[in-house]
Amino acid sequence: MRTPSWIRTLRRLALTSLAFAGLAGGARATWSIIIIDRSTGEVAIGCATCLENFDLQFWVPVMKVGVGGGCSQSAIDSTGDIRRAIWDGLDAGDAPLDILRTIKGFDGNYFNRQIGIVDMQGRAQSYTGGGCGAWAGGVKNRVGKISYAIQGNVLTGSPVVDDAEQAVLNTTGDLAEKLMAAMEAAAADGGDGRCSCSVSAPDSCGSPPPGFDPKTDKSAHCAFMMVGRIGDVDGGCDKTIGCGNGSYFLDLNIAFQTMNDPDPVIQLRTAFDAWRLNQIGRPDHILSTKAVTPASAPGNGTAAASLDVTAIDWQGVPVGHGGAIVTVQHAPGSASLAAIGTPVDHGDGSYSIPLTAGEGQGQDLFEVVLDDGVSPVTLFPYPAFDETATLTSDVASLSAAAGGTANLSLFGPEGTTPSYLLLCSASGTSPGMPIGPVVVPLNFDNVVVLSFLLRNSAHFVNTDGALLADGTQAAQFTVAANELAGLIGFDLAFAYFTHSPVTFASNAVVVNVQP
């Protein structure tokens, strides 16, 4: 159980004089790990050090949910100015390198600092001042959707950082799994050499030190891990409360330990496994499915769609029962066009929310929150609804074995009743076909020729005609059983253009051919 906040506050006050006397000149916060995942919006931070009776989470991290994270270590940030500069810089969208330059400009102790910063744009920096105790150094990188900064001082050696990096890169699962594995990898190499080797010469024994056993020997005395997800709430940031005090998806803090307590990374693993156990059967922010069908519609004020949600837990298992309170609103960045209906609980862990397109053009994003009675879970990435469509299909796929029909709705220029021609391609949508002043988003192939020759046939119904006065029209693509057997796995793209004269080309819609 986490120590009550008022007790932690009293401890900090009681230890303030000790911290300043014993740490201000040569404070060491040993290794820290900052990871972000741009695709999920997660920010993960972990840190450990060989200091007794200390709350590392109060002094080191900066957590900005959905924005980025940082750590200030080696020389204690007693004024809070370093962490506040990171906080404000991330909030303003400043690049981590520019934030470091800002800190260097006002900090007289920059030579003794070690700082890591990563933002949600994937930019990462790791700075190690020349005054940091050996072994000291760090790495930063951007690999796919993951960016990270890992740094440490008074370590047993570079393997502490290097092996933590490999754990980040090679561990499967979400950022919580990656962070836990990276903390354990660092600890397995001895971590803070003052605990595993020598207080006066932390890097003199090797990494890991001879005979070091991470199951029984100590790599640190205190440690923390936190993961912020979209929907979590930032705390504040100043010298009295720290900058990692919000409400987070994962928040484990092993503080105020002594040399007689078990290694804090071992304690983190125990707490982590218990936390994971409690997440079984609960909706996961990221793995829960959410999609709008159809994904696009015209912004005509009447087009209907459905936002469909299925609750999935962190192991990828459907929750399987209803009962969650579902709230849906337009997310940040949404065009806020569509009207949102009342959620429908299907009783099996799936929910449907009716949508009605608004009048106008743009893309809506929806913030879906499932509250299962334990805590609210905000689903991410936000599902999108594109209200700029000038062509839609009521199906996303057709079965080659069964055949079927794709009903195609055209939404073009109003008032002029222009002639149109709808075509189909099996070769993609880009770069498309230039026709007069427009580009029709279909690549020319034999299917385009076939759709032209068979226009207004039993297969391509009403694909050559005139739009109505309101700019709408309806067409169909219909196939019998096994007629598409040779196109299994292909995407059939449809688009139309107006002609006589050519003035307009629609978007493309894709129908996948399945077995």
Model-derived regions, located:
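Bacterial N-terminal signal peptides that target proteins for export
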Residues: R2-S17
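N-terminal nucleophile
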Residues: R28-I280
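Short S/T/G/P-enriched beta-strand
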Residues: R276-V317, I325, P332-L337, V369-T390
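Extracellular/luminal low-complexity segments enriched in Ser/Thr/Pro
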Residues: P298, S352-G360
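Low-complexity "stalk/linker" and mucin-like segments enriched in Ser/Thr/Pro/Ala/Gly
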Residues: Q329-D348, I353, N462
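Surface-exposed, short loops/turns at beta-strand junctions within beta-sandwich domains
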Residues: A357-Q363, A485-I488
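Short, aromatic- and glycine-rich surface loops/edge beta-strands on solvent-exposed regions
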Residues: G362-D372, L422, L492-Y496
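Residue-level hotspots within well-ordered secondary structure
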Residues: T388-P515
